[in-house]
Amino acid sequence: MKNKVVFIGMPGCGKSTIGRLVSEELKINFIDMDNYIENMTSKTIPELFEHGENYFRDFESLACRELAKEGKAIISSGGGVVKRKENIDILKEESFIIFIDRPLEELLGDVDISKRPLLKEGREKIIKLYEERYELYRLCADKIIRNDREIGNIVNEIKEVILDNLEMN
C-alpha cells in the first residue's frame, strides 16, 4: 500500500497550504518540493529558471526520484511536475496523487506572480498554463479535490481520503 500523498495542481491552488494543514493534523512529515529543490541546489526557483525551464525541470525530476524514496510524507509538488511523464510515473509508484482543483477565476485573483517565474507575463500566462495543464492534472490524479470552499472542509475531506486509501499509521 502507498505511504505518501502528492498534491498536484496549478500555482496558487493551495497545494502547500492544504498540505501543511493535513500533515499537521495527521502528524505526517510535510515536504514542499520547490523548497526541497532550493535546498538541494542552493538556488532559488527563479535563479534556476534563469538557465531555462528544462534546467529547472531536470532538478525537479531528480527531486521526484529522491522523494519517492522517502518514508511517510505529504508532498506539495511544483505546478509543472506533470509536464514530464517520468515524474508522474516515479511518484505514482509509492504515492497517492491528489489534484487540488481550484477554479481559474480564484487563481487569477490570488496568485502572487512576482515569485513564480513562469507567470511573469500575468493573467494571460496563467490562463494559458491552466489550459495546457488541466487535463494532465486530471489524468494523473488518483483523486480530485475541488478547492472552492472553506479550507477546513477541504482538509477534512483529504484526511478521510488518506485514511481510507493509504498506509499512514
UniProtKB/Swiss-Prot annotation:
Substrate binds at D34, R57, G79, R133. It is found in: Cytoplasm. Its EC number is 2.7.1.71. ATP binds at G12, C13, G14, K15, S16, T17, R116. Keywords: Amino-acid biosynthesis, Aromatic amino acid biosynthesis, ATP-binding, Cytoplasm, Kinase, Magnesium, Metal-binding, Nucleotide-binding, Transferase. InterPro entries: P-loop_NTPase, Shikimate/glucono_kinase, Shikimate_kinase/TSH1. Its main location: cytoplasm. The keyword Nucleotide-binding applies. One of its GO terms (molecular function) is shikimate kinase activity. Pathway: Metabolic intermediate biosynthesis; chorismate biosynthesis; chorismate from D-erythrose 4-phosphate and phosphoenolpyruvate: step 5/7. Its cofactor is Mg(2+). Belongs to the shikimate kinase family. This is Shikimate kinase.
